[in-house]
């Protein structure tokens, strides 16, 4: 429901506050998911883009001018990408199966500010390849951007146990 979606966004705000104020890591478990929600409308079971909203919220805090979002999921976070593409102070990295719903996330798209890294993987991708991609692409991209805050938008549908997906982590 709408009320639950608002509670989820507030949980992400609380997570950002814990990290910035208490210098601790935070883990927010919130439903509905968010990475398909576009700047102006919901999509793909997502009402609000929790990670994108949390990144913008973090940028309002003193001393925070660079936030990165790392998204791993079997689906590309098209909504998060759309939000990040308009803000040079947020970087977005997505590992996702491609081609697959929603049909976005080609590795050629980097955004106007070159702050987007899409890493499409084929169905059947294993943990070994995923780890290699982290070491060779994700970590260098995030290190170069040098964020003061890293937000992880973790999808768990790329596991071997999820029979609706083809990635085998």
Predicted regions span which residues?
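Conserved alpha-helical scaffold segments that buttress catalytic/binding sites
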Residues: 13, 17, 27-169
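Conserved ATP-binding subdomain of kinase catalytic cores across diverse folds
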Residues: 7-21
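Catalytic cores of large soluble enzymes that bind and process phosphate-bearing ligands
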Residues: 4
């Amino acid at each position: 429901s709408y009320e639950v979606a608002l509670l989820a966004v507030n949980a992400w705000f609380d997570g950002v506050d814990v990290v910035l104020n208490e210098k601790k890591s935070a883990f927010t478990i919130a439903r509905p998911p968010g990475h398909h929600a576009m700047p102006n409308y919901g999509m793909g079971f997502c009402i609000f883009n929790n990670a994108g909203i949390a990144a913008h919220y973090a940028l309002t805090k003193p001393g925070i001018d660079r936030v990165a979002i790392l998204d791993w999921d079997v689906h590309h976070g098209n909504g998060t990408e759309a939000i990040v593409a308009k803000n040079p102070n947020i970087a977005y990295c997505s590992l996702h199966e491609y081609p697959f719903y929603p049909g976005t996330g080609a590795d050629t798209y980097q955004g106007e500010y070159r702050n987007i890294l899409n890493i499409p993987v084929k169905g059947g991708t294993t943990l070994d390849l995923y780890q290699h991609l982290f070491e060779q692409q994700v970590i260098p991209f995030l290190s170069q951007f040098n964020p003061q805050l890293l937000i992880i938008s973790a999808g768990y549908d790329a596991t071997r146990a999820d029979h609706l997906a083809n990635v085998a982590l």
